[in-house]
């Protein structure tokens, strides 16, 4: 556990050179090796699924909609499904292996030994990023034939239609393929029972609608980018170098991979060395004991409403946010986004600590939580994308993937905020050491 795939390390392109955001030319070769429709769900492994899921439910406005635990006949693990719009989070923790009947597990890829090693190394963390495909079996075969490291072969679930399979993504995180039969009820996977009557679901809703992107931190970009591109066929959607995003003290390099529809986005970060301070990416890798999911970006339909609801709960069981930018940031904002945001909206952005960036296609509004667990690793990003509306073949409107970019103009502010947070933690450790 905690080591990069040997398959990933063995596949090295002839040349890997980042050109930076300014020189990067975006194109979509439509090169997927198997159809990828959307993010299906994210599964977190933790020590206590009940309380962890309740904290995320309260903090993000995601009600509990389905469960698989002792009450449903599952003696292997407790899993609780939260949902808001198309966004699905699953939280899984094991029961005692000595009392469990492994065949009762609703997620057949669950492993007691893997869970124990995973949570010991990483604490609360993302175990699986699931994508919906036409056929889990076909996607798995196509991926493995192109170098993907197999984790769990295809399994057909209890409804005899839904199937899942897993391959290595990075670190101890897996990419899970999910295909649903024509009879799927849309709730989740067979073996999960629906909770409640839907009334509470309507009441607990802060406006979050889907997963926009899942960001991974890795020691080295080159082998991981090449590994993922080779077995998925995903293309490079964007890239950033330390010169694009760094501060005077630390930095990163980043590549964003996308599927054909550009609605499944996988940004990947590596640390930069030789700076005054250790890169935040390296800090993550140290505390996470290896590569893993750094943050999940969640799309909201109204970021002002979402942030008002989340901030009301920050001190009472919800999530805290990174410090807001200085007032000068917002004084300069009107010249950058005044044609998209009204004076009242810019004022609301300052009040809530929302960052704004834009590219030649659209505008991005974003904000970041502090780490959501005990370790300074995993955090959440809340975003709203404005613009880039397109018509599909049926004449329906949709928003182009990645509209407004990934906040290149805000990386500096984010890094400064994280640096100050890390300095605060370090000062506490130094004080404690001096007093010992």
From Swiss-Prot:
EC number: 1.13.11.27
Any single GO BP term: L-phenylalanine catabolic process
Lineage top rank: taxon: Eukaryota
Top EC category: oxidoreductase
An example molecular function term from Gene Ontology annotations: metal ion binding
Compartments it resides in: Cytoplasm
PROSITE patterns membership: VOC
InterPro entries, alphabetized: 4OHPhenylPyrv_dOase, 4OHPhenylPyrv_dOase_C, 4OHPhenylPyrv_dOase_N, Glyas_Bleomycin-R_OHBP_Dase, Glyas_Fos-R_dOase_dom, VOC
Cofactor(s) needed for function: Fe cation
GO terms under cellular component: cytoplasm
Cofactor binding: number and manner: Binds 1 Fe cation per subunit.
Annotated metabolic or biological route of this protein: Amino-acid degradation; L-phenylalanine degradation; acetoacetate and fumarate from L-phenylalanine: step 3/6; Cofactor biosynthesis; prenylquinone biosynthesis
Occurrences of domain VOC (ranges): 38-194, 210-370
UniProt key word Cell cycle: no
Assigned keywords, A-Z: Cytoplasm, Dioxygenase, Iron, Metal-binding, Oxidoreductase, Phenylalanine catabolism, Repeat, Tyrosine catabolism
Residues reported to bind Fe cation: 213, 295, 381
Record-stated family: Belongs to the 4HPPD family.
NCBIfam families hit by this protein: 4HPPD
Name assigned to this protein: 4-hydroxyphenylpyruvate dioxygenase
Species annotation: Plectranthus scutellarioides
